[in-house]
Amino acid sequence: MTHDFMIAFLTLELHIEAAQSLKDKRQVVRSLKDKLRAHFNVAVAELDATGLWNCATIGVVSVSSSRDYLDGLMKNVERQATRIANNGGADVADSFIEYL
């Protein structure tokens, strides 16, 4: 029995201009992660730069049997993440989607 499924992985590189400390950064990152989880059925985690107060790398993952569904989902997540980040004093400096 084989299962055909795809995994989509969105990476967001954030620059957090408003952060003056790690506490400020954590607040922005936590808000972004919580809002994306609540709005979309995705897994979200901070991946890199955990010790730097002005940047963060966020990973977003979803699994589906449909590439079209994943493509639309990840583009919507990316748009929403940009809005949330901008409202929290951060910018999405770079983003990319990978499929496995």
Language-model segments: residues:
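Positively charged, small/polar-rich N-terminal and surface patches that mediate targeting and assembly
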Residues: M1-T2, A38, G88-A93
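C-terminal structural segments of small proteins and small subunits
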Residues: V63-L100
